């Protein structure tokens, strides 16, 4: 039911309609797995036109709905929602919104994430079927030409694309399902005045899926083919498409076998004088039909028989009659009858007799009576001819549908299904007959389903579930359905059957009887009886039906003469089309057409009521099939009879989602920690309380849901989408947990491997460098004094100190500037000096860079030119050109490369000279000529040998050589026979724990227990419970939960480390209890000092002290100043070291036993001599020393903020015997006053102890 079936031309285009979101309509379909694209912010998102959901309208009225649809239609937005009911307006043109890119954008998305679209309805149906295991159906309604067939095809397209399945049988099923569209459209669709591709039959396609949501089969049920179209059409309409396809594009084989000619040659295809459809290529459509037959699996013989029947129908229509002398019908052209007999493979005489003579029998007393042959007049003969044609085509169409179902039979068990109903729309013509009555009756039944499932059922359910609800008034069309189908009181169909039974011989008499029966319906407010016609007030409007010919159309029975004719055929396919044998003795009235359509409609309703429905309401914007025309009046009429306004009101006042407590809990129990544990259902209460708990734990507001008697009602779809998103996220979180644990384990393994590798490299990686260092001793052969630093055990011959061989960094810049080839291996690089001779001045060392490769020696200069650094190779010497290397026997770093060329030999000063000699000997493969003597020889000019003398100078700097006037002054070095010291042992440090991966305790191996282990258990593990009203799954017995363990105290690292190296003597399953934790170590003691003299600060960074004050030592400097802090005020500052006496805390001794009580003694009497002695002592007190001249510089030292005052430690306090707890600045009493000599002795002993510790550290180094 689209606008057109195929554009003229070879390229096949989409038949869809709607706004395109992708510019390229011709993108090919991407096979394979769907590509998940990275989410991006849509900066170019188009602004919404109107409202995309009619429930968001500020004013609810038919006019407001019409205005919104018109606004969106004018901007190519043809889809609009009413909740999850989709309203579609046919634009009669292809806007390219059904491309693969657009389809992928709706994959896995809910309704609110994407704009309204038929793909969204298909996605929702497929998701609900797969997630909730409920059968789904999509009911597409609307009048003829509104786009129902197009919507059905797009739903099939989407489901076939997203349903997955890489198996060949599943793909074959998809292909066959899609192939049913062109096949059934060719045989079941036709051009009408309102629609170029109108479905003239009803189709319910049921897609069958397995448990994985993959299509495994399908089944098609067809309803009431309009077979009268085979023999006649009104002007500007066509017969079924297949007749024009066959007559225009039949291959020569069929033209020769079946005498196929152009459509103008046949009465059945030329009566309406309409042979073509604008924009439709019948030749290309016929190729699609043949291809679809092949995909379905029709053999060539089956296809030949199908087209044989089509040719027979066309030729039967060309049989003409004329009156003979008796006024009876006679065949005008016997050759046509002969060819029809050839096609049906019957005797031509039997064809002649069946079309012109009717056999009648008389009954006598229940026995068979006489048989009479009654000639037919021309009118009766034409009716018999047309009846034969209609019967052949009707049965042929049923056979095609059955053949398709046979190919689509499921090959594996079916779990669920999705049904798609594509049935003819409501029709109102100038002359409406029995066909329109049946079509409109079926649409009334569909409207009744919509009312029952969306309006009435929704309100009834709210009342039944005791939900707070405001009732909405609506029109229930059940009265119209009863008017047509009821038997008591008799309806239209009952009156029609009665008329056919009582006046079956004469069609005119039967029609008059039918009119008389209709008078009994005159009291019905939805019915009006008029002269020769009657009016039924349908939901879509009042329709006037003509009574003429209705009884004949309702009989729908083939004369026994015609049944005998086809029964005598020699073609087995004809017998397949007419399988029932003629029962001559059967006197029962066969079912009429109205009986069949009523039974089919009721079966369809029963099928739809078993599934979860989705609705698409199609609207036809105009009757002219014009692309941009919007007829406001026509659309407003459709809005009214479709009941969109009532649907919007109920949707806004109702609930978007409702589900029984059991299914709700089964779906969402994972979202609450109280109803699930590790994926198991653990709730022990009933389903209703479980649902309440889930909604509570997911923080759903109370106004967003209501609890009914058996169901939970969720008000807005956003809430449901939020629950679904949280449920999906639960599984993502579980997967992330597993992934995180695995990645932690991998990180732990990698970290352990890295540590082993690091240790191995540290142990063995330096061996090669040590070999090179030892080789340097062999190069010198004990002929040259050594520097002390060269003999350190930690010395390694690394070679490329400047990183010339590295990629990036300054080394690469030097390499590029010097032009060093990338193929050269860098053996050595270092900064040094080269002796430069200048005219008129003495030679002077100048900085250079020395680079040794496996082929050259480069002397690289760095020069500033216009404040720009320029790097260039000042001298490039091939190593093969070096004849000798000359150096002195002292420890200096000078040597010369004797080349003997036209340029002077370079005299170089390099601190890593021995390493250079070693690498140069390696590059020369041991052919290095190293000259060691008292003088260094080199060619200052070509052929002019010059010498540089090296002398020992005790006054020279120990680490720097001095060159002056061809003399090198150097200090005495180590003996030439010296060798390198052994490699020092690494300083003992605490083992660093492996913390990556979070698999070990925070302290690492032997460390404290993990945080998880020390944290008390929150609750015991709950037992899994069976889901409500479900069979309990067989599971392994789960042990009873153990009581939560009491957390153990965290042991100290020392004790834990010791425990980690202790082997457990018992291998039994019961472990011995852990030893009690050791006592906590005492707090670290703070270094303090006692002020010996008063000191007044002269600068802001110095600290004032008074004699007897006790201050805390923050740091000690070697320049005679200590950084101290006043323990009372927390003020820091510098104090002269000579003014302080460092205090050493006494070692605590065990408390002695209490002394015996002493006898009381008299208080001493103060004498005058005591005061005099004190005054004398004050006069004899030595003067304080002068502070160091070099005061501390605070500019380069970062200020240390004063720490907060800490509680005094009595073990460190110098006034520990003072129970009053002074500030430390008070004068010590006479019993604790130490002499100055004693304090200095204690300070010396402390210093000696500290120095001893430093020496130990050096040894460890």
Curated annotation (Swiss-Prot):
Residues 49-728 form the Myosin motor domain. It comes from the Eukaryota. The modification Phosphoserine is found at residue 370. Residues 786-973 form the TH1 domain. It is found in: Cytoplasm, Cytoskeleton, Actin patch. Residues 1160-1181, 1234-1243 have a biased composition (Low complexity). SMART domains: MYSc (SM00242), SH3 (SM00326). Signal peptide: none annotated. Type-I myosin implicated in the organization of the actin cytoskeleton. Required for proper actin cytoskeleton polarization. At the cell cortex, assembles in patch-like structures together with proteins from the actin-polymerizing machinery and promotes actin assembly. Functions as actin nucleation-promoting factor (NPF) for the Arp2/3 complex. Plays an important role in polarized growth, spore germination, hyphal morphogenesis, and septal wall formation. This is Myosin-1. It comes from Aspergillus oryzae (strain ATCC 42149 / RIB 40). The gene is myoA.
